[in-house]
A protein has these predicted regions:
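Cytosolic, long alpha-helical scaffolding segments
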Residues: 1-190
Length: 190
């Protein structure tokens, strides 16, 4: 009985890693589409969001089956509960990639970016690292990695503050490009 449960937990971990890879790819492609103002790629990312939603449902179903059929002990129950919480957050990150893509489509008809997008690119890189490390921390049950992810969130917050400050200055200096700056702030917020 326990070996079947362990197999299902292993399957859960594999599905979590798979979903993480899907989201990482979605974020990466969304940022690339944004950088290059590529509306066609952005549309494809938005269409691909439903695959992430299906993966979330698959993982939630697996968690419910583990809870109902296996009656896990405390440690295993925490693992399953953590997976259910994480998968919801992961799906939301996937939604943010779709939101960035939506903004890319809106901004793709604009003139080339006059605002600095380097901090947004850095935020995306940090976010992808956080996602990878969070999944690793979950799978490995590694509290130290989880704490690193929490600290990394502060780095992303600092980058967002820099983006905000730069955009405020940019709008003051170039009010004619204020809308583009506002749109970039929305992208950074996602």
């Amino acid at each position: 009985m326990r070996s079947k449960f362990d197999e299902q937990l292993k399957k859960l971990n594999e599905e979590m890693m798979h979903m993480g890879s899907m989201i990482e790819e979605s974020i990466q492609k969304a940022i690339e589409a944004f950088i290059h103002q590529d509306a066609d790629s952005a549309k494809a990312i938005m269409e691909g969001d439903s695959e992430i939603d299906r993966e979330q449902k698959k993982i939630e179903s697996l968690c419910f089956n583990l809870l109902m059929q296996q009656q896990p002990v405390a440690r295993d129950l925490r693992t399953i509960s953590a997976a259910m919480k994480m998968v919801t957050d992961m799906e939301r990150i996937g939604d943010h990639a779709a939101d960035i893509s939506e903004m890319t489509i809106l901004m793709s008809s604009d003139k080339p970016y006059r605002v600095n997008i380097e901090h947004v690119k850095s935020m995306a890189s940090e976010t992808m690292l956080m996602l990878i490390r969070a999944i690793e921390a979950y799978v490995e049950k590694n509290n130290d990695k989880a704490h690193i992810v929490m600290k990394q969130d502060d780095v992303v917050d600092e980058l967002f503050d820099k983006v905000k400050a730069e955009l405020i200055d940019f709008i003051r200096e170039h009010p004619e490009d204020g809308e583009q700056a506002e749109d970039l702030l929305m992208v950074a917020k996602y």
